[in-house]
């Protein structure tokens, strides 16, 4: 009999894999399931990107091993996009690396800088991979609560001095998944000062920067003067361009941090398929009005679903960011109990807040990644539960 390693034994079932299992179980029972669980856009990748990939498939250069750090042309496109979008200067040779989706980079990054016993500061509730990556690297995850009364921003002053001194990395993610909370440059400035004081690496996950339904564009932490001294930022084409299945992302920022991640990657993978990078170049140069069309869809969905659920009496954290709604569970339920009732009695898959950590208890998350008519159908089914 074979036994899992200790590092695997301490991991809970991966949240989204468990949701998928429950969904498939209901589908096999003949239930018309509405999946509002995983943040996987239902819209197609814009056609110019697909056409670029088709053309790139014919290029024999893309049939060979790719560069470990990514094609220069893709890294240059990333640097140019950061300059246009955030007015941040990046050297494509030393401050940009191509990822096989940002999840891969996030999971691998701690391996470059965390020694056994080092502390990794992980927000809670949060994307589970921050904590998982720390565990795989032999680090000790330390929970930094994100509370609604603080607009789901970490309270840096509450981190004990001895913990801060032992910390190697602090993870942040704004616009935030799962809460949809926005970032502020004021918070980023305070965080950069704090990180410099304690010599802590800031690892920023900015995957949702282009998914906003208001007029205020989310910033990058790299806009803060001096942030590049301590920060690396992970980004992805998945959410912005409906490319979750393409697995293409990037990490940018401090050149030593980028180089460390690169050293891990050269030893564990062989880079991203060249044709996908060629398509990524087209994505990064897509006219802004094309991305705005995608945002318009989420604007409509968020408005309609927020109104429908608030009429039922559900309390929603109002935000102009991400394609999620972060909602308080009705009184008398835990997160798991309520989400369990939704799938069992209404055929709706949602994500329990406690799946993102203990401070997510009392909430659930829905993804606005199905057509409007399905969202309204979901709202009607919830209404019929007579909560």
Curated annotation (Swiss-Prot):
Tagged with keyword Transferase: yes
Superkingdom of source: Bacteria
Pathway: Amino-acid biosynthesis; L-lysine biosynthesis via DAP pathway; LL-2,6-diaminopimelate from (S)-tetrahydrodipicolinate (aminotransferase route): step 1/1
Xref: SUPFAM superfamilies: PLP-dependent transferases
Swiss-Prot/TrEMBL keywords: Aminotransferase, Pyridoxal phosphate, Transferase
Reactions mediated catalytically: (2S,6S)-2,6-diaminopimelate + 2-oxoglutarate = (S)-2,3,4,5-tetrahydrodipicolinate + L-glutamate + H2O + H(+)
MF GO annotations: L,L-diaminopimelate aminotransferase activity; pyridoxal phosphate binding
Residues binding substrate: 14, 39, 103, 127, 177, 365
Residues with the N6-(pyridoxal phosphate)lysine modification: 239
Keyword Transferase: yes
Enzyme class: transferase
Entries under Pfam families matching the protein: Aminotran_1_2
Swiss-Prot/TrEMBL cofactor(s): pyridoxal 5'-phosphate
GO BP annotation list: lysine biosynthetic process via diaminopimelate, diaminopimelate-aminotransferase pathway
Binding-site list for pyridoxal 5'-phosphate: 68, 102-103, 127, 177, 208, 236-238, 247
Enzyme Commission number(s) from the entry: 2.6.1.83
PROSITE patterns documented for this protein: AA_TRANSFER_CLASS_1 (PS00105)
NCBIfam families per record: DapC_direct (TIGR03540), PRK09276.1 (NF006756)
HAMAP family named among the record's database cross-references: DapL_aminotrans_1
Stated role: Involved in the synthesis of meso-diaminopimelate (m-DAP or DL-DAP), required for both lysine and peptidoglycan biosynthesis. Catalyzes the direct conversion of tetrahydrodipicolinate to LL-diaminopimelate.
Assembly with partners or alone: Homodimer.
Annotated family: Belongs to the class-I pyridoxal-phosphate-dependent aminotransferase family. LL-diaminopimelate aminotransferase subfamily.
Protein name stated in the entry: LL-diaminopimelate aminotransferase
Organism from which the protein derives: Aquifex aeolicus (strain VF5)
Designated gene of the protein: dapL
